[in-house]
């Protein structure tokens, strides 16, 4: 309606301004540009949010499908392991028995466990011998233990580990005189410790089974 009035006025050569009631509804160019800019911003924001929701929905769907497949695979593996755990042998007239299949992982674990136990015992015996040498021969300027006496001392300590820190019998105790020989030279701590360790390791290897002994030698 406004455009028609403007056209008629233009044709007649007269310029008639619309009333104030209509002038308030006409927007300026700045307002139009501002509105268009706001619309573009809002449109971009809505499209971005829609794309994010679309991607999130797609990822959630893919994750759900992946979890479903993973759970199915785990279930199938569990059922297969349960089915292959034993071999069922059905013989007419004989009670049904289940024979477990050999498990290499279990055998390797047991062998490793046995090896660790042997190493631990070996280390504990070596440490014990060093402690004995340091305790019993710390002040051995006058006496030195011969090989036979040292062997007896080691065996006695292993049989009675609670008496390791008991004082060594003196030379005047009769039966224990063979543990000592008199010398004017100072005892060689290194040689005493080394000999004690060699004795313990030799006894330890003799106590092991053939397989363990072969592994120790290698």
From Swiss-Prot:
UniProt subcellular location: Mitochondrion
Keywords: Mitochondrion, Ribonucleoprotein, Ribosomal protein
Biological processes, Gene Ontology terms: mitochondrial translation
Keyword Ligase: no
UniProt keyword annotation of rRNA processing present: no
GO annotations of cellular component type: mitochondrial small ribosomal subunit; mitochondrion
Subunit structure: Component of the mitochondrial small ribosomal subunit (mt-SSU). Mature yeast 74S mitochondrial ribosomes consist of a small (37S) and a large (54S) subunit. The 37S small subunit contains a 15S ribosomal RNA (15S mt-rRNA) and at least 32 different proteins. The 54S large subunit contains a 21S rRNA (21S mt-rRNA) and at least 45 different proteins.
Biological role: Component of the mitochondrial ribosome (mitoribosome), a dedicated translation machinery responsible for the synthesis of mitochondrial genome-encoded proteins, including at least some of the essential transmembrane subunits of the mitochondrial respiratory chain. The mitoribosomes are attached to the mitochondrial inner membrane and translation products are cotranslationally integrated into the membrane.
Family to which the UniProt record says this protein belongs: Belongs to the mitochondrion-specific ribosomal protein mS26 family.
Protein's name in the database: Small ribosomal subunit protein mS26
Species annotation: Schizosaccharomyces pombe (strain 972 / ATCC 24843) (Fission yeast)
